[in-house]
């Protein structure tokens, strides 16, 4: 090894140096590129984070600024007391009753407004053209409007701020297109006429679509100029100040109401209320120096006079504590209650148990009856058998007998146990009808006839059928002169009157023979040799010992000799007869 190191020392060191230099340069390059890439990524992420933060801040600023710009928009939560009452389904006459009042003030307007409504409602050119036409007629009434409408400003002085003007002027310009009349606000006399004209026209136009679409329900809407209209105009502006800044959206609400005609006519009143709120706002900006102030009570009273239903309704207060109804249990005096029933009889109180025995027996009879005893049941069975087999006249007595038997057994038997709650009670057998009569058969009729002739015969034993044949006649006693023939018979007769059956039979046979011999009957003559019957032909015995043509052997030929039967196994004999051997295929004789 030492020689190898000494020989290759230079080449090894030079190779290691080269590899180290190359590796160092590679690691430097990788480190530089990685550092640059990480730096770029970190910078990009930092910029993205900054942009996101700036965007979020901008959004927050916009959200913060939106309430200032849109401060005049109303809140979405509105007091429900300002809405008109809904139509009643149960009493539709109330919906029609309110329509008859404004009809008297309407006839003057449709003649003026009908040609105006023929034009599209949303045309911009229709509004300025209508201003000069309608200005002269409602001028005196509009003057009243101007005089009566300024009071709201002192109540909410915050409406005179600039954002409220800008927020209100923009919707007025876009929705109603009234820039030229607004320029006339510089003149105080025209300021009274023009805003009222501008506000009056949209209200009239909101009336007309309701007239044509709803025709009748549109009439409950506040009427156009009349002696009562100024009062209604005064009544309607106050609600918006109570509920908040609600003056800017009226133009939008006025145009959104006509599309839903299918709803009830009571939903038409809100748009005119919002439309009447326009003149106070326009006059707040220009008629700021007018400070005629009225107490707040004067604004509340017209609202109450407008409709009594609004004053009676109260908004639901979520913070109010819930009224809980407490159920009071009635106290019962336990001393006045009767004692509980005993375990033996749950259906009756214990007082009834102390009553007389007659009442108790009646109660037991009406309820469940105890099972009869064995003796009474046997008597009942025998009586039923005898009564059913004798005559039908005994049937009524049979029906009355179980009741007497049951009454006798009840007097000795203790009161019955009550039935279990899950099992039905026992049924009184005496309440059942009597069993049906059995159909008379020939055997029963014959038996009844025999019993009628001989009443001494008892009833048929239980479990036996009445025989169809009458009983045999009694055997006559044997005469004493014939007793010498048989010693046994004389001994038996001498010993007593009762003779055994064998001797009686033999005596009867002898008597019959003697009587037949006396009459010379042909049945008693002994056969002679000439009249003997021919002998019986013996049966041929087919055995193989006989000479002649052998007959085919029988299957049971092996069973003929008794010796073979004892020696041969029966199973082997069965095999020989059932399954022949090889040399006995054709049943040849052995």
UniProtKB/Swiss-Prot annotation:
Ranges of Low complexity composition bias in the record: 108-148, 157-218, 383-393, 400-411
Q: Where are the compositionally biased (Polar residues) regions?
A: 275-285, 295-314, 358-368, 497-514, 521-531, 555-568
Q: Which InterPro entries match?
A: Aim3 (IPR031370)
Q: Which GO terms describe its cellular component?
A: actin cortical patch; membrane raft
Where is the sequence biased in composition, kind Basic and acidic residues? 45-56, 342-354
Pro residues bias located where?
A: 236-273, 413-422, 432-441
* Keywords carried by this UniProt record: Membrane, Phosphoprotein
Localization: Membrane raft
Q: Its GO biological process terms?
A: barbed-end actin filament capping
Q: How does it sit in the membrane?
A: Peripheral membrane protein
Q: Which gene encodes it?
A: AIM3
Chain segments carrying region Disordered: 1-571
Major place of residence? membrane
In its UniProt entry, the species of origin is given as Zygosaccharomyces rouxii (strain ATCC 2623 / CBS 732 / NBRC 1130 / NCYC 568 / NRRL Y-229)
Family statement: Belongs to the AIM3 family.
What is the protein name stated in its UniProt record? Answer: Altered inheritance of mitochondria protein 3
């Amino acid at each position: 090894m030492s020689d190898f190191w000494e020989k290759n020392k230079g080449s090894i060191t030079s190779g290691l140096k080269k590899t180290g230099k190359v590796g160092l340069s590679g690691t430097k390059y990788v480190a530089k590129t990685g550092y640059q890439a990480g730096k770029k990524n970190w910078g990009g992420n930092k910029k993205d984070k900054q942009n996101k933060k700036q965007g979020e801040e901008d959004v927050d600023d916009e959200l913060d600024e939106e309430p200032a710009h849109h401060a005049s928009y109303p809140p979405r939560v509105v007091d429900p007391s300002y809405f008109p009452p809904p139509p009643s389904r149960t009493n539709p006459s109330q919906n029609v009753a309110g329509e008859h009042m404004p009809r008297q003030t309407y006839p003057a307007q449709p003649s003026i407004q009908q040609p105006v409504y023929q034009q599209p409602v949303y045309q911009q050119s229709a509004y300025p053209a209508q201003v000069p036409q309608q200005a002269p007629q409602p001028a005196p009434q509009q003057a009243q409007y101007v005089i009566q409408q300024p009071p709201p400003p002192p109540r909410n002085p915050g409406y005179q701020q600039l954002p409220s003007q800008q927020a209100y002027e923009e919707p007025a310009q876009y929705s109603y297109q009234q820039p030229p009349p607004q320029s006339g606000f510089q003149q105080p006399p025209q300021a009274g006429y023009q805003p009222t004209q501008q506000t009056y026209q949209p209200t009239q136009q909101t009336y007309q679509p309701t007239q044509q679409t709803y025709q009748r329900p549109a009439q409950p809407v506040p009427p156009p100029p009349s002696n009562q209209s100024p009062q209604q105009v005064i009544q309607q502006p106050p609600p918006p100040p109570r509920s908040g800044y609600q003056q800017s959206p009226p133009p939008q609400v006025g145009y959104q109401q006509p599309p839903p005609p299918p709803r009830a006519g009571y939903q038409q009143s809100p748009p005119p209320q919002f439309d009447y709120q326009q003149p106070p706002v326009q006059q707040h900006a220009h008629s700021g120096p007018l400070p005629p102030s009225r107490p707040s009570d004067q604004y509340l009273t017209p609202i109450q006079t407008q409709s009594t239903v609004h004053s009676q309704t109260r908004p639901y207060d979520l913070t109010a504590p819930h009224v809980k109804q407490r159920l009071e249990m009635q106290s019962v005096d336990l001393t006045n209650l009767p004692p509980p029933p005993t375990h033996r009889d749950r259906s009756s109180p214990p007082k009834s148990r102390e009553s007389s025995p007659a009442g108790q027996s009646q109660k037991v009879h009406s309820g469940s009856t105890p099972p009869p005893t064995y003796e009474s049941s046997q008597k009942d069975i025998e009586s039923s058998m005898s009564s059913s087999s004798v005559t039908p006249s005994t049937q009524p007595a049979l029906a009355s007998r179980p009741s007497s038997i049951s009454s006798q057994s009840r007097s000795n038997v203790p009161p019955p146990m009550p039935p279990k709650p899950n099992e039905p009670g026992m049924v009184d057998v005496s309440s059942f009808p009597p069993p049906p009569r059995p159909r008379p058969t020939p055997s029963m009729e014959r038996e009844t006839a025999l019993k009628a002739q001989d009443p001494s015969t008892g009833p048929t034993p239980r479990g036996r059928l009445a025989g169809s044949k009458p009983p045999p006649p009694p055997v006559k006693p044997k005469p004493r002169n014939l007793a010498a023939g048989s010693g046994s018979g004389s001994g038996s007769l001498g010993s007593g009157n009762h003779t055994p059956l064998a001797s009686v039979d033999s005596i009867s046979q002898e008597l019959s023979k003697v009587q037949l011999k006396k009459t010379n009957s042909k049945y008693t003559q002994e056969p002679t040799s000439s009249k003997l019957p021919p002998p019986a032909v013996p049966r041929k015995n087919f055995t193989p010992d006989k000479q002649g043509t052998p007959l085919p052997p029988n299957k049971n030929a092996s069973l003929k000799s008794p010796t073979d039967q004892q020696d041969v196994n029966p199973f082997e004999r069965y095999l020989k007869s059932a399954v022949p051997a090889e040399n006995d295929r054709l049943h040849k004789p052995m």
